[in-house]
């Protein structure tokens, strides 16, 4: 047997205090508020932020009564932006709101201004979306992405619970894994490099930062079997990261789409998720594609699976559905595609119904806006439910 091919692959993540992620969370908190009161809300909510300012803008048609300013301040405060020193003061920052209603041209074509039956509702726009799954982790997600995401989550956890009180909200992680390729399957061998850059108080030493990150963030997250004496650690390599959040960088909704999905694995059609109601197939199409790909792998039909679906605006049926198992399938991809089409309805109205996507509130969508939309063990993430394909 030929030797297995070895290679390095890298995925990154950012935590909830990153400016772009602030914006994703605000946009999805607005979506939650609209859907909680009016499940038929049509929402396309964008957010941007910079020093001392958060702006919410877009197109929203809803019967809900929404206090946009209160949502902005609440989200920013929960993240930890409670003073200008840390990057933003949630109570004192300027909040700008510029919301218009959805274009009636779009509304009549997509949902007939509310008159179309569920199965007739068309896609809110054209586009192509992807779902991906791999058997290399219990979550059926890429290990590089899982570790980078969990490191970011742990950074926030030890900041909020006081274990590392010197931490501030902004931070980034990156993980490089050495893989071997067996056929089309990816087999993780070891963690090659871990990079963490985290915002911190000005009085903490770099030595203390390094010690705490190793002890309280890396060791609890990364399985010991993947670490060895050759693993490289870059922990706050720039030497100083005091200025962060919107004070350090401008933020915008929808700029972390690879972090939101598969860390560079699989493929991406380019459409962002946050702030969009289920008629926007950028979101709902990607969710159903993930459920389909995950179900293929969980059913033992392949070790890896990529599903693509594409749409036209105002047309209910997808233009195409594609599957690629990278040569790992137990049957031809054409047969797996038949099973996918048998078990999954890709029409936007039915995606919304079958995955219960019109239900907002309880931070249902806000939760998705930090630490990834996929591979999460949470009943609100209905698209992670596996269907047995047979």
From Swiss-Prot:
GO biological process, one term: S-adenosylmethionine biosynthetic process
Gene Ontology terms for molecular function: ATP binding; metal ion binding; methionine adenosyltransferase activity
Enzyme class name: transferase
Source organism, top-level taxon: Eukaryota
Positions annotated to bind ATP: 18, 170-172, 238-241, 249, 255-256, 272, 276, 280
Annotated residues for binding of L-methionine: 59, 102, 249, 280
Localization of this protein: Cytoplasm
Cofactor note as given: Binds 2 divalent ions per subunit. The metal ions interact primarily with the substrate. Can utilize magnesium, manganese or cobalt (in vitro).
Family: Belongs to the AdoMet synthase family.
Described function: Catalyzes the formation of S-adenosylmethionine from methionine and ATP. The reaction comprises two steps that are both catalyzed by the same enzyme: formation of S-adenosylmethionine (AdoMet) and triphosphate, and subsequent hydrolysis of the triphosphate.
Record's subunit section: Homotetramer.
Protein name: S-adenosylmethionine synthase
């Amino acid at each position: 047997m030929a030797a297995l091919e070895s290679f390095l692959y890298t995925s990154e993540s950012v935590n909830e205090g990153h400016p772009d992620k602030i914006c994703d969370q605000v946009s999805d908190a607005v979506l939650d508020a609209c859907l909680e009161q009016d499940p038929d809300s049509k929402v396309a909510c964008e957010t941007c932020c910079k020093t001392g300012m958060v702006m919410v803008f877009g197109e929203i048609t809803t019967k809900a009564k929404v206090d946009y300013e209160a949502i902005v301040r609440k989200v920013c405060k929960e993240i930890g932006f409670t003073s200008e020193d840390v990057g933003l003061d949630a109570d004192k920052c300027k909040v700008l709101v510029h919301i218009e209603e959805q274009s009636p041209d779009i509304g009549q074509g997509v949902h007939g201004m509310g008159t179309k039956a569920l199965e007739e509702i068309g896609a809110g726009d054209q586009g192509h979306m992807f779902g991906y799954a791999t058997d290399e982790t219990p979550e059926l997600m890429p290990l590089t992405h899982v570790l980078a995401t969990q490191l970011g989550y742990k950074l926030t956890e030890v900041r909020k619970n006081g274990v590392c009180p010197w931490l501030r909200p902004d931070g980034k992680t990156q993980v490089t894994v050495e893989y071997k390729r067996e056929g089309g399957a990816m087999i993780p061998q070891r963690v090659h490099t871990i990079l963490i850059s985290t915002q911190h108080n000005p009085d903490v030493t770099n030595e203390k930062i390094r010690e705490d990150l190793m002890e309280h963030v890396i060791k609890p997250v990364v399985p010991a079997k993947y670490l060895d004496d050759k693993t490289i650690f870059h922990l706050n390599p720039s030497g100083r990261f005091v200025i962060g959040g919107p004070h350090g960088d401008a933020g915008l909704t929808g700029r972390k789409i690879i972090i939101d999905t598969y860390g560079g694995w699989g493929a991406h059609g380019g459409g962002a998720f946050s702030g969009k109601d289920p008629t926007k197939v950028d979101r709902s199409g990607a969710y159903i594609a993930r459920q389909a790909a995950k179900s293929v792998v969980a059913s033992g039909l392949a070790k890896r699976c990529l599903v693509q679906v594409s749409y036209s605006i105002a047309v209910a049926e997808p233009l195409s559905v594609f599957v690629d198992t990278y040569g790992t399938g137990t049957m031809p991809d054409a047969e797996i595609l038949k099973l996918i089409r048998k078990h999954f309805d890709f029409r936007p109205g039915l995606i919304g119904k079958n995955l219960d996507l019109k239900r907002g509130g309880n931070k249902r969508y806000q939760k998705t806006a930090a630490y990834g939309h996929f591979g999460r063990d949470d009943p609100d993430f209905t698209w992670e439910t596996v269907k047995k394909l047979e």
